[in-house]
Amino acid sequence: MDLSTKKVISAGLVFIYALSLAMLVPMFLASNQGVISAVINPATGGNCLPGRYSGIVQASGVTLPAVNLSYVAPFTSALPLLVYSQSIFNGTLYYYNSTGSYELMKKYGISITPVHQIVNVTSRFFARTTEGVIPNTLPPYTSGNCYLFNTTPPTPFYYSYRTLAMVNSYFPNTQYINTSSEISDLYFNVSYLPYNTTLTLSIYATPALQGIEGIIRFNFSVKLCANSTIYPYAEYTLHAYFYFNNSFICELENIKTSIPGVASATSPTTIHFTSTAVNYILLVDLGLWSNVSTVYVTGVEGATYPSDTVATTINNGSFHPVIIPPAICIQYKTFYSNQINPELPNTSGPDSIPYMIANVTIYSPDDMLNWTYAQKYVGCIAAEYANPKWNPYCKINEAWYNNYGHGGNGLTVTLMVGNNKVLSINYPYLALCHVSYTDGFHNFVYKFSIEFLLSSVDNITYMLTTVAPNSTGLGGDMLYVLIKPCQLKDATILLTYNDSDYAVQHYFGPVDREIAVVCNNIKVYTPLLYMPKCVPISTPFFYGQVIDYDYGYNYALVGYVNTYYFNATSHQYYKVGQYVDVQHVSGDSELVLGVCPGYKCASLSIYYPNTPPYYPASHEAKVGKIMGICIEFANGTMERIYLSPSNITALLTTNVMKQMAPMPPFWNYSFEISITGLESILHITPNQALTVLNNSYIIVCYYDIASNSTVHNMTKLVSTPVTVAISPPSQAFYYAPATPFDDIVHPGCQIFYFVNVNATYPITVTLTDKSLGELSPTTIVTTTVTCIYVILYNGTMLHYNSAVFPITLTETAPSSGVFTATLYVEVTNSKGTPVTAYPLNYSYIAIYNPATKMQIIVGKLSNIMPLVPSKYFKVGVVVDGLSANSTFTLTEIPNVIYNVSPIIYNYIDGELSVTVAANIPGYYYSGYLVLTIYNCTAKPCHPIYTYEIYFNFSATSPHFVAAYDLLFLEPILNGHTYYITITAIVVPLTYEPFTTIGFEGKVFSGAYFFSAPAGS
C-alpha cells in the first residue's frame, strides 16, 4: 500500500469518527404530542438554577415520569488521567542468522508514563442522564403539568469526549528512554526487535476525579515483522498494528534501510465512560457545569419508564447553571443617641452605636447539600416546615479538595487581639433561613449570631438551635465569643467562610473567591456613669446607672423581619417592609460588688446567670472598680467612705447591681445609694441630715477595664426647696395723736374724750419644706418658729426666740410639705392691753397667735418712732434657717374730723353751722368742735372769742352737724371779715404729765365774711 492510499484511508477515518462524535450530541426521539414549554427556577421565575437544586419543568399535552438531562459545554477542557498499571507481553526471543556471523537480538522493551502519574487529555465533553421527577402541586406553578427535577441528580451519567489532537506514537532511535506526556503524544521506546514477534501492551488509566468508579482500559497490540530478502543486508519492511478499544486503528509504517528504524503515524480518538458516584464533581471538572454551560431538558413520555421503549418529547427546554461565590453580611441593631446618653437627642446618626450582638448572614446559594430543602411539604404557610426532608441543621463541614489547595471546610471563626491570633475554631453548623417568601419555594441563606461575653478566659463556643429558624428570619445558632475585658477594645472577630460547593472551589478557587472573609470589630466606648443632679435628703435612696456597651446575656438578633401583604386574588404574600430588631431570649446579667484591700475601692464583676458551654465555672468576670465614694459638705469639707462590706451594704443597699429590664439598650446596670445608710455611716439623725447634708455632694468614681478609662459623677443633696412666706395685712396701721385743751369754762380741768380704734391685724406664715413633710408620709408633721424679730424704721432690730413664744406651724395634710400658722400684730399700751380708749401715742406692738398670746412690748412709739407720717416697722420670722418678713406702715391721721359742707352763717339768728365727718369711719369718736374768732383777717393776731360744741360719731352715724349760736356777737360780726378756725379736739381717757397728747383736727381755718342784711 502506497503512502497516498494510506493518507486517503486516514482522512476517511477522521471523517467517520467526526461523524460518530457528532451523533453523540443529545438527539431526542420525536413525539407527536408532548412538548416542553418552560424550565423555571421556582424562587426567581428565571431559568438560571444552582446545582443540587429543585427546578420545575413545565410540559403540555403529556405526562412525564422522567426527564433527560443533557449537559453541553461550549469550551474544551483538560481531562487528567491517572495511570494505575501497565503490562507487556513478552514474545519469544529469536536469533538472527546471517552468513558468516551470528548476532543475538536483544530483548525488546516498551516504556510508558510511570504508574500513578497524571497525563492530561484536552477535549470537549458531553454528558447525559435520565432522572425521575416529582409532580409539583404547589402554587404558583400549577397550570399545566409541572414537575420538580434535580438539576444535578446523583444517578449514573454517560460521558463521552473526543481528542482534538491526533494520537501520535513515536519510536525514537534511543535506548529505553522513560518519558511522559499527554496521551495524544505517548512515547514508545524500542530497541533491536526480532523478526516475527507480536508485542501486546496494556495500559490501565482513569480520570483523576472522585466521581469515577473503576478504571478505563487501554489495549495496544503491536506486531513487528522484519524479512531478509538478499544478502548482504537489503531493505526491511516494518508493519505495526495498534488496537484501542477496538475502535482506534493506527497503521504505523515506515521503510528504513536498517534496524532499528524510526516510524510514526496519527489518528483521532473518541472515549466513552460511565460515572456512578459524585457526578456533580465530574460535571464541574469536565466543564459541563459552569456559568456558560447549557443543560437541555427533554421529557420522557409514558408510564413505562424506565423501559427502553419510551418516547421523548418533540422538543426540549433548557436552563443555565449558575455558580456564585459566597458572601458574608453582618447586620447590627443600633441604638438611638439618647439611649447612649440621655442628654443626646433621640435620633440615629454618628452618636448611635450597635449592640454587642451581630447577626451574620452567609449567602452561599451553591452550598446547599440537598435539593429538597427548597421544597415545602404541603404548601401551607402555617405548616411550612412540615417537610419531612427538611433539616435546617445539616452539617456543612464536608470538605472538598481540589488542585488549588482550598478545601470547603465551612466557617472558621478566629479571635484576633491586635495582630495576634488568640484562638480559632471551625463552626460546623449553620442554620438555613429563607430570605424571600412565596407559597412554594424559598431562597436560603445561612444564619447565625455572634455575641460577645466578658469572661476571665478567652474562648469561642456555640450553642446549637438557640432559636429555631422560622418565617420571620429569626433563628440560627448562637456563637459566643468569651473575651477578657482588657482585650475587648483591640479585639477583632475574623469570619472565614470556605464554600464547600465543588463548582465554587473549581472556578473561583484560583482567584481566591471561594472564600468570604469579613471582620467584626467591637468599638469600645468610655462608659457613662449616670447620677441625678439633685435629690432631696428626705428621699430614702436614689438610683444611679453604669451605662456602657451592651455586654448583656443571651440576645437573638432578627436579621430581616418581614412584613407581608396577602393578595387574595393571586394567593401570594408580598413583602412590604423589613426592619432589624433584637429579642431578649432569657437571663439578665448582674454586677457583683466585691471588696478590695484597704477598703478604698470595690471591684465589679459581671455575672451571667445562664452561661453558654465552656464558660468559666465562676460565671463572672471582673469588669471595673468603684474607685471611691466621697461626701463633699457644703463648707467644702471632703470625707471618703471606706467601702467595707458593712458600708457597701448600708450605702449601696445591696452588693448586686441588677441589669435593667426588660431589654436594656446597653450594659446598663442600676445601683441604689441609700441616704438613710449614709446617715447611719455619718452617725446623724434624719432631722440633723436636713441641715448637715443640705447642699452637700455624693461623688462616685468608676474605673472601666474595657476602655481603660475613669469616669465620675455627683449628686447634690438638698432639703428640697424650702420657702417661708409672710402674707402682710391688707391695710396699714393708723395712729391719731391728741393735744391737751383747757376748758374755757373751767380752766385747768382736763376734758376727756373717747376714740375707739381696732388695731389688730393677722399675718399668715407659710413654710414649704417637702423633705420635712416626707419624714412621716402618713401623719401630719408640725414645726416651730425659730425666731420672731421686729425691725424698726431706723434699722433697730429686736429678736425674740421660740422659748418666749412657741408658735407652731402645722402641716396642711400628710406629706404635703406645706406648714402654716397665723400671727397677729396689735397696737397696745404700756400695760400690754389692746388700745381701746387709751392714748394712741402710747401704743405698743403685741405678736401672738390664737393659741398663745404673746405680747411684745417694744417701747413707746413716741420715743422710738417719732409721731410723723409714713413711718414703718417690719415683723419677721425665722424657720429652718430661712427668714421672711412683712412691712407695716404707720400712717398719721391728718384730721380726725373734716367738714363735708361749707360753713354757713345766718345773720338773722346769728347761727354758724357746718357738717363734719370722721376721717376714718367705722369707729366711735367723741369730743368738742372748737370755733375760734380772731380780731383780724389773717394771722398772727389774737383770738377774741372761743365757742365749743360737743360731738360724737359712731360706726352707724359717721356725720355730725355743728351749729354755733353767735347772735350775741351779731353787732360786731355782721358785715365784717374775721379769721376763724374750727378745730376738733379729741382728748384721751387718761393723761400722763409732761406728754403732749392733744391734737387739733382742723375742720376749717381762714378768713370768713359774716354776711349782713342789705343796707345795714
UniProtKB/Swiss-Prot annotation:
Chief localization: secreted
Keyword Ribonucleoprotein: no
Induction: Constitutively expressed. The level of slaA transcription is much higher than slaB.
Signal peptide boundaries: 1-30
UniProt-annotated location(s): Secreted, Cell wall, S-layer
Keywords carried by this UniProt record: Cell wall, S-layer, Secreted, Signal
UniProt keyword annotation of Iron-sulfur present: no
Record's GO cellular component terms: extracellular region; S-layer
Family, as annotated: Belongs to the Sulfolobales SlaA family.
Subunit note: The mushroom-shaped unit cells of the Sulfolobales' S-layers may consist of three SlaB subunits and six SlaA subunits.
Function comment: S-layer large protein. May form the highly ordered outer sheath.
The name this protein goes by in its record: S-layer protein A
Annotated organism of origin: Acidianus ambivalens (Desulfurolobus ambivalens)
Gene designation: slaA
